[in-house]
């Protein structure tokens, strides 16, 4: 087990560990605190953004399903979903032809047109983007103030995420105050998954 692996190291050595980056898995946090009593726990930034993204994704789908499947709002929300997940500041400025709207538009114009179909979606989109902004700019106080202001008003998708963030508030603030992350490790894991997917189950590419 992970516990037994790290217990191979003397307590004196483990006490020298200053930082640990991890996801929000409840099982590992108590273990990390026991094994490395002097370390600050840092929630990996990727996982924080991922939680917010999933909450908005589920919200968009729920609102999308309120429309007829043949309607323009439904098709716009379904076909251009990736644009809504992005940080709005990173949307491309290059126009493209939208088969959904039958016209050439910039990504931000597609987003604006689609948000006009639903005030509820527009409100959640603005909340999501503001949370991303505060997080990316490392404004921890503003990030959590926004959560506190909205936790009683949001749907259960966002409420669940907000409660999780509340629970790990200090660890998330640590993520905003330090430069540590699991980015390289996550990138390696993704590469391994991609290789396995492309391998179609073959264990040895020589036998392919």
Report each predicted region and the residues it spans.
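Acidic/histidine-rich catalytic cores and adjacent linkers
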Residues: 3-42, 46-50, 69-208
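Short alpha-helix plus adjacent loop in nuclease-associated cores
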Residues: 48-69
């Amino acid at each position: 087990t992970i516990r037994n692996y790290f217990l191979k190291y003397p307590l004196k050595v483990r006490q020298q560990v200053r930082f640990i980056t991890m996801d929000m898995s409840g099982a590992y946090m108590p273990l990390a605190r026991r094994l490395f009593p002097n370390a600050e726990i840092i929630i990996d930034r990727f996982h924080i953004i991922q939680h917010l993204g999933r909450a908005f994704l589920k919200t968009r789908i729920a609102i999308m399903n309120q429309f007829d499947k043949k309607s323009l709002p439904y098709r716009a929300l379904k076909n251009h979903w990736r644009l809504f997940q992005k940080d709005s500041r990173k949307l491309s400025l290059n126009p493209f032809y939208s088969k959904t709207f039958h016209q050439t538009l910039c990504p931000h114009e597609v987003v604006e047109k689609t948000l006009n179909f639903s005030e509820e979606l527009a409100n959640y989109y603005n909340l999501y983007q503001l949370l991303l902004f505060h997080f990316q700019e490392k404004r921890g106080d503003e990030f959590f103030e926004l959560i506190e202001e909205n936790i009683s008003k949001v749907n259960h998708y966002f409420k669940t995420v907000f409660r999780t963030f509340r629970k790990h508030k200090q660890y998330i603030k640590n993520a905003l105050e330090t430069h540590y992350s699991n980015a390289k490790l996550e990138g390696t894991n993704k590469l391994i998954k991609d290789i396995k997917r492309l391998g179609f189950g073959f264990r040895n590419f020589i036998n392919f």
